[in-house]
Design a protein with these regions (language model features):
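Hydrophobic anchor at the beta1->P-loop junction of P-loop NTPases
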Residues: 5
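Walker A (P-loop) phosphate-binding loop of P-loop NTPases
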Residues: 10
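Walker A (P-loop) ATP-phosphate-binding motif of ABC ATPase nucleotide-binding domains
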Residues: 2
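Post-Walker A helix-loop "phosphate-sensing" segment adjacent to the P-loop in P-loop NTPases
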Residues: 21-31, 47-48
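Hydrophobic positions on the alpha1 helix immediately C-terminal to the Walker A/P-loop
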Residues: 16
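ATP-dependent small-molecule kinase phosphotransfer cores
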Residues: 34-111, 121, 138-146, 150, ...
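Short, well-ordered beta-strand core segments
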Residues: 128-132, 184-186
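Conserved lysine of the Walker
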Residues: 13
Length: 210
């Protein structure tokens, strides 16, 4: 079974995806980490993120499991990630990687949960279950602001909200890789606890598998 979980930043999709994968013993892939991992590997090897050969080589040798303990959320890595993500050949390599992960889950597991921004629409358009997890911008900004503060990073709520609203606008207007698949089931987490969202999705998947 392939479960595609898409949604904007700080909607709660990552937390949900991990819990669903753990509950059903499915393989889990946070696709957002892939571009960061490629950016990190390019820098680690002394390469240039904008250089296609360096970036493609890093993408082709990527082993996400080997980077589980690496902090991929530094500004340097984020900057490198945005540069490698702009290279079509890198996007193609990672698209193939994601599709292979979904079709052949590691460890011989019975299913895969992929969390990202275009899983149901581009990566796995034939996924058995497509979810679009969302929440009001101000709620998502509140969550992200709290998350950054807990990590000891400087953050102000107005700045986080402005960033989230700008990103939402880019997503709404982009023609390539639309965020929400037309046949995805939308779940608004604004006024729901993580447990309530998990229970709702678990029940949907159990019904589907019955």
């Amino acid at each position: 079974m392939i479960v595609a979980i898409d949604g904007p930043a700080a909607a709660g999709k990552g937390t949900l995806a991990r819990r669903i994968a753990g509950h059903f013993d499915f393989a889990f892939l946070d696709t957002g980490r892939l571009y960061r991992a490629v950016g990190y590997l390019v820098l680690e090897k002394g390469g240039e993120p904008k250089n296609e050969a360096d970036a493609v080589k890093a993408a082709q040798t990527l082993d996400p499991g080997a980077l589980e303990t690496v902090d991929l959320h530094t500004e340097t890595v984020a900057d490198a990630a945005s540069k490698v993500a702009a290279i079509p050949a890198v996007r193609q390599v990672l698209l193939d990687f994601q599709r292979d992960f979904a079709a052949n889950p590691p460890g011989g597991k019975a299913g895969a949960v992929l969390d990202g921004r275009d899983i149901g629409s581009v990566v796995c358009p034939d996924a058995d279950m497509k979810l679009f997890i969302t929440a009001r911008p101000e709620i998502r900004a509140e969550r992200r602001h709290k998350e950054l503060q807990e990590k000891g990073l400087e953050s102000t709520y107005p700045a986080v909200l402005a960033e989230i609203e700008a990103r939402d606008e880019r997503d709404r207007t982009r023609k390539v890789s639309p965020l929400q698949a037309g046949d995805a089931r939308e779940i608004d987490t604004s006024d729901k606890t993580p447990d309530a969202v998990f229970d709702e999705v678990r029940a949907i998947i159990e019904d589907l598998a019955a």
